[in-house]
């Protein structure tokens, strides 16, 4: 009798372990693959065309992380066509730009322009007036990280004039 009980218990544990293993594999596969695929798709797509008076030229935005009260951060991929650029603006919580492709410019008010290429990182202090955009001959793509959004939204200022922009490229 003890042998039969032992065999039943062993079968039950083996069967239970097998089911638990299958469930774990299914859960891991269902959670990890779609997240990776979603991120890859998001970063490789241009996103939505930005219809705003805060930009000169054509640019697209693909949001990766929408702002919320838990993380107080928004992250988006911005793609600028050649010559496209933002207006002068500032972020109460600062901003970080991670250049992923192309050739572009970044300038703080009263300072020289910085030329940006793939791999460059720009850390912009809070409330620093600046603009960024593409070179005249090449698309420009960067990931924009806006931390500490609880400090307030971006403050848009005047456009970067064609005269200002053209002075840079000469």
What is each PLM-predicted segment?
Residues 28-72, 154-170:
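A short, N-terminal "cap"/entry segment at the start of jelly-roll beta-barrel domains
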Residues 3-16:
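Bacterial N-terminal signal peptides that target proteins for export
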Residues 74-91:
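Conserved short histidine dyad/triad with adjacent acidic residue
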Residues 137-156:
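A short hydrophobic beta-strand segment most commonly corresponding to one strand
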Residues 88, 106-107, 129-135:
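Short beta-strand His + acidic residue motifs that chelate non-heme Fe in jelly-roll/DSBH
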Residues 110-127:
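Short acidic-glycine-tyrosine-enriched beta hairpin
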Residues 92-104, 109-110:
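Glycine- and acidic-residue-biased ligand/ion/polar-headgroup-sensing regions
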